[in-house]
């Protein structure tokens, strides 16, 4: 094993705790909002602003976070993000005004976005090639666990006086543990991949004996500017296009909006009592956790490319199935948001409410349970999670029902179609959790040179957030233009394009060091790389594998 067991455990802990903080912060607002909207007499617009504040903070972090990560280091960025989580939590606990709540949530969003990028990059650099996929995927598991913990806290603290302060404050606990854990890990982990890759010597021991300064690989001699991402130097333009393709297809396959209709689908198959809704949410949570565990187990065995392809194929089939079935199973796509106060909203506020609202259930109890369904379903990579969390919380601020409940008198074939829809949605969630969810971020943490990896990762991440916003804010217009069924079918077409993109352009990176991956991208074209990816898993005992590839494809 490349890393000593304590170091490996610490690396896994850092990845897991980072995901827990991310998931908890996105999920906890659902319970807190139930109290806050009464305490502060919030309008719909104010509730939506409070929920969306995390999203805007995260988007801001994705724009400037790469500079922080590359200039001050991955570990420093993670440590700083924990301190920012602490600051944001204190603001939320101590505040007595609505606008300070906004400031606190924006601060939290900024922190968890920085942490998510830095964690994925840091862990990918500190572990051996055969461990990288598993440990980076642990971040996804942490997100799922964090959301489940937030749901439990929402339940247990619901009757406590000023419960929202405790809800926000508990985020300090996992952040503090992550802060302590990472103090025992090296500050410059990328050197680990250069040293004695087939022995048990790790970076920490080499740094202590001074051996790390005797050799500096030329990969880290190279300096890059941000503009190099768009130039042909070392095939950087190709790498950028690959990263952008992955994050854009991750969003444009419709993943956020499909899950906005989870409550409608559950109601259409008869989950209308409290116990049934809880069962549905638990079932979806089990599917999510199981799928994430599958991704962890097979990321370094089956490989990133295989899981991306398999996940995207299942997603395409599932979303197409939902589209076809929804021609028969009527689901009301109307969105509404009712204010808890008597204050009038401006037309602008009303428009924002319509754009950001989702399908609502009939009672506040069902709203809360549907909210948990969304949270469990959306335990995925950073931007996707943030937007889904927004949808969850907006369930809570609804007062009017627009769901068409299933009737017990419906014919059996109609019931079968409802269940097909439900199973298709679960398959979609599962496939995303195995493929696009974790694999996108593993690949992004691998394909860029170390000197610009943070900025490149953040650049792609900003497009992910932007695409997530775009697809959400245009969803109503698309439905109004072509209908809900055709919207889902359109996502299916995008899924087909994503399959082609992955098949023809995404290489396999399992089993390779980050330096070998960088060399391959620097010395040959992407199509050549894909053709040779079948032999990637077994590296020669000496000498870099790209030499053999170069002989096969002389330029």
UniProtKB/Swiss-Prot annotation:
InterPro entries: MFS_dom, MFS_sugar_transport-like, MFS_Sugar_Transporter, MFS_trans_sf, Sugar/inositol_transpt, Sugar_transporter_CS
Record membrane topology: Multi-pass membrane protein
Catalytic activity: D-glucose(out) = D-glucose(in)
Keyword Calcium: no
Any Pfam family: Sugar_tr
A molecular function (GO) term: transmembrane transporter activity
Transmembrane segments: 16-36, 49-69, 83-103, 106-126, 133-153, 166-186, 241-261, 278-298, 306-326, 416-436, 465-483, 486-506
Cytoplasmic side: 1-15, 70-82, 127-132, 187-240, 299-305, 437-464, 507-555
Alphabetical UniProt keywords: Cytoplasm, Glycoprotein, Membrane, Sugar transport, Transmembrane, Transmembrane helix, Transport
Gene Ontology terms: cellular component: endomembrane system; membrane; perinuclear region of cytoplasm
Residues given in the record as D-glucose binding sites: 250-251, 441
Function: Facilitative glucose transporter required for the development of the cardiovascular system.
Protein's recorded name: Solute carrier family 2, facilitated glucose transporter member 10
Organism: Xenopus tropicalis
């Amino acid at each position: 094993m490349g890393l000593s067991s304590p170091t490996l455990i610490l690396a896994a802990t850092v990845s897991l705790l980072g995901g827990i903080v991310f998931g908890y912060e996105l999920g906890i607002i659902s319970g807190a909002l139930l109290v806050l909207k009464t305490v502060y007499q919030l309008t719909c617009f104010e509730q939506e602003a409070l929920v969306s504040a995390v999203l805007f903070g995260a988007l801001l972090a994705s724009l400037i976070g790469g500079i922080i990560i590359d200039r001050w280091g991955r570990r420093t960025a993670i440590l700083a993000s924990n301190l920012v989580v602490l600051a944001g939590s204190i603001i939320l606990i101590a505040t007595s005004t609505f606008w300070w709540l906004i400031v606190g949530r924006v601060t939290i969003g900024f922190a968890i976005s920085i942490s998510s990028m830095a964690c994925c990059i840091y862990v990918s650099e500190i572990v051996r090639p055969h461990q990288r996929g598993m440990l980076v995927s642990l971040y996804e598991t942490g997100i799922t666990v964090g959301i489940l913990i937030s749901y439990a806290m929402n339940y247990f603290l619901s009757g406590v006086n000023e419960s929202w302060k405790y809800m926000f404050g508990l985020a300090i606990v996992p952040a503090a543990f992550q802060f302590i854990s990472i103090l025992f890990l090296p500050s410059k982990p990328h050197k680990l991949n250069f040293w004695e890759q087939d022995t048990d010597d790790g970076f920490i021991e080499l740094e202590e004996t001074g051996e790390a300064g005797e050799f500096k690989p030329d990969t880290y001699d190279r300096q890059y500017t941000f503009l190099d991402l768009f130039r042909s130097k070392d095939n950087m333009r190709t790498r950028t296009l690959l990263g952008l393709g992955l994050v854009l297809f991750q969003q444009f396959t419709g993943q956020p909006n499909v899950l906005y209709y989870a409550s409608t689908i559950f109601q259409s198959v008869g989950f209308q009592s409290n116990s049934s809704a809880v069962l549905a949410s638990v079932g979806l949570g089990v599917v999510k956790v199981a799928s994430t565990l599958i991704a962890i187990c097979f990321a370094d065995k089956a490989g990133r490319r295989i899981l991306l392809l398999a996940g995207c194929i299942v997603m395409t089939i599932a979303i197409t199935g939902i589209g076809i079935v929804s021609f028969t199973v009527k689901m009301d796509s109307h969105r509404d948001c009712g204010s808890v106060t008597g204050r009038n909203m401006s037309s602008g506020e009303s428009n924002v409410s319509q754009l950001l609202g989702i399908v609502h259930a009939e009672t506040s109890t069902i709203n809360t349970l549907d909210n948990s369904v969304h949270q469990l379903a959306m335990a995925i990579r950073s931007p996707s999670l943030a937007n889904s969390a927004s949808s969850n919380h907006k369930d809570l601020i609804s007062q009017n029902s627009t769901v068409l409940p299933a009737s017990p008198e419906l014919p059996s074939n109609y019931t079968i179609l409802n269940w097909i829809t439900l199973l298709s949605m679960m398959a979609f969630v599962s496939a995303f959790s195995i493929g696009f969810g974790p694999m996108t971020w593993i690949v992004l943490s691998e394909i860029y040179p170390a000197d610009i990896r943070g900025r490149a990762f953040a650049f792609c991440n900003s497009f992910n957030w932007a695409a997530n916003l775009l697809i959400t804010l245009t969803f109503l217009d698309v439905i109004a233009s072509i209908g809900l069924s055709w919207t889902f079918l359109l996502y299916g077409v995008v899924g087909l394009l994503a399959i082609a993109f992955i098949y023809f352009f995404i290489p396999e990176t399992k089993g390779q060091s980050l330096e070998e991956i960088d060399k391959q991208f620097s010395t040959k074209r992407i199509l050549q790389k894909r053709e040779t990816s079948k032999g990637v898993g077994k590296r020669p005992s000496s000498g870099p594998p790209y030499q053999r590839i170069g002989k096969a494809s002389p330029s």
